[in-house]
Amino acid sequence: MNKQQLASKIWESANKMRSKIEANEYKDYILGFIFYKFLSDREEKYLAKEGWDEDYKAEFLHEEYKPEWEEMDYKQKDHLESISSIQRNLGYFIGYNNLFSTWLNKGSDFNVADVRDALSAFSRLINSSHKKVFDKIFDTLQTGLSKLGDGSNSQTHAISDLIHLIKDIPMDGKQDYDVLGFIYEYLISNFAANAGKKAGEFYTPHEVSLLMSEIVADHLKDRTEIKIYDPTSGSGSLLINIGRSVARYMGDSDRIKYYAQELKENTYNLTRMNLVMRGILPDNIVTRNGDTLEEDWPYFDESDPIGTYDPLYVDSVVSNPPYSQAWNPVDKETDPRYARFGVAPKGKADYAFLLHDLFHLKSDGIMTIVLPHGVLFRGGEEGEIRKNLIENNHIDAIIGLPANIFFGTGIPTIIMVLKQKRDRTDVLIVDASKGFEKVGKNNKLRASDIKRITDVVTKRLDIPKFSRVISRDEIRANDYNLNIPRYVDSSEKPESWDVYASMFGGIPEGEIDDLAAYWDAFPGLKEVLFEKRNRQYSTLKVADLKAAILGSSDVQNFINGYKASFEGFHEYLNTELMQVMTGVNISKEEAILSEEIFRRLLGIPLVDAYEAYQILDNDWNHIAVDLEIIQTEGFSATKQVDPNMIVKKKDGKDQEVQDGWVGHVVPFDLVQQTMLSDSLTAIQSIEDRLAEITSGYEEALDELPEEEKDKDFVNDDKTAFVWPEVKKAIKAKEVDVQVLAILKKVSSDNEEEKKLKKQLKDQSGALHIETKKTIETLSDEQVYSLLDQKWISPLIDGLGKLPESIISDFIAQIEK
């Protein structure tokens, strides 16, 4: 399975296994066990490098020293040195009996007590230099074990199911951090979708996080070392996305230091787990479990607060704090975070969080923060803070997000971008509320929405109905009210009906003028299509609108110009992807392809380059998965097939069983369409004939007189024939001639249907086996050809359809 399939399988099983436990709670247990497996596997990998085999681990990998070892010429100091070496290198020690693999090998002897003992031992054996990273990290899991069942037996059963569910997650290589991280993020997002209002406590939707990350990364792209900080870190995903985006420019991710603070202990533990599992060095992880507004961050060691006091200033702060949370503003006027700007009101801490973030920025730093849109226009203390932020030139951009984009709340939200020092005095305002797709109950930013917003913010673009750079004087004139509709009107033109046109015919000139972009692109077309009736109205003078438009030389020039712009693009993609599969930098390649598409579209009218980018992104997601497999498993993985596992009920329980095979990289259906087309065509012919027979049954039922449908040869709900009774009726010949003819026809078809179904089963089975053999014996050249058709052809086809879509939309606007 690829990482998406594995993540989906684990989620589906976990969601069933949690039973009555709240999603918000159950996530802490499964994610805790995944983290324990990660640490355990990591230790075993370290031991393997040190030459420890399984027998040696079983004998000597123990916390306690065994006296009998003296008789075997092993000294206690050697044993203690082994433990010390593991702790020094990893930051912790897990004994043999507490390894995740040992739990699995115990089988029916495994018990919940094994987990309790292991977690207790882990806390005891953390290296002192790694206390801040690992101390109490399993407390939430340890205290929650009792909630997994009413007694020891049921708890043991639940935990056993859990550890067997996650045992296949790979954790043994640098590339696999992405698999592990993907699954971890996938589970968090799905638990958030099922956690209602509590989701906001630990999760920022990936797309929002990615948008914030891209804006920050562009600002920091030329730096060689950075510090980033999230004062309300939740699961840590926002920090991780920032780090990943910045690392694309820096190259060395080990030069990024992560700071995080989180109030809730269980969520704080998620932050640390997530950071560690992404391969971030422990020395680059600095976290604190505390109240951000009450306990500001200057770093200090608890054993010597005064001597180790060090104010924290970072390159970037990112946060998604709780919206309009109550807080205690008493005696905060002299707090250096708020002294310059003012103190947020008691009932709404939004600006308290913002000012906290701003305080910790370096002079050349950048911050992004998610806030309820009320911060843009509410008065009182908040109005004064807003004024001071504007006058001190800190607000760089405001981005209005789509409604209902966060789990558990429909509150309208914004992202505010601020900088400690700016050369400009204006503010960019972006209304991105209209760009999204509906996914389940929530709205979700598409890849094209994220790129469009990022480009507008980083390039500070004015785009009608989307973005506008506002001068400070205009903001002053509006009394520092930053409500987005005051500056950017993204509303659609209201639909109107022209009474004169309705009564006397004709098309209002205003409606024709609304299509100005098309007339600019097709300068001679308007005269071909319309004839002026008077100054205010025109009439359509062509009988076939579509034919007239498609036959226009202007339109043909547009289509041909578009095609010419992508001349050689297939070959370009082949060079970029096919010829250097193992060397493609997966994290950077999509941006490279995107730049090429945007370059080719320069000067092409009407085409929205971001629509083209969305087509690329849709295809890239599949390409990236395949490239990951090829780069981690080798090119031979393209000639591999995997068991197709499905879930079936057996004795009332879901059981996973094999149902044929699937291509590991190359899909069965692609091989059948391109290399086994004769067999596939024969099967499709049988399927077509079976569909005809089924349709014939329905027609025959319709032809039967109503009184005949009450007879035994039709079922009770009059939707199908009863075949044994049909044969009896034919034999008895007690129906009229017309009905008898119908029965004979459907009976004959039924006999043919039985034979065809057997043929279909036999031929489908044979084709399936033949496809398996074909994939396993593919030549390298055949693999390249198939991957070209899987990766590149859909992208070329999708881009090729854009002009057709534009013309169709143009025709529809004239016709409406």
Regions found by a protein language model. Give the residues of each.
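Conserved S-adenosyl-L-methionine
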Residues: K198-S319, S324-N328, D335-F341, P345, ...
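Non-catalytic, mostly N-terminal accessory regions of nucleic-acid modification and defense proteins
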Residues: M1-V216, D283-V286, G400-A403, V427, ...
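Short secondary-structure boundary/capping segments
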Residues: L275, K332-D335, G383-R386, T413-I415, ...
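Conserved, well-folded catalytic cores of nucleic-acid-processing
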Residues: K16, L165, I169, Y186, ...
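Conserved P-loop NTPase
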Residues: I415-D455
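Conserved Class I SAM-dependent methyltransferase catalytic core
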Residues: K16, E22-F38, P345-L418
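Short, well-ordered loop/turn and helix-capping segments at boundaries between secondary-structure elements
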Residues: D41, M277, Y323, S363, ...
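Active-site lining segments that contact anionic ligands and/or coordinate catalytic metals
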Residues: Y313-V314, K348-D350, D364-I366, N392-D396, ...
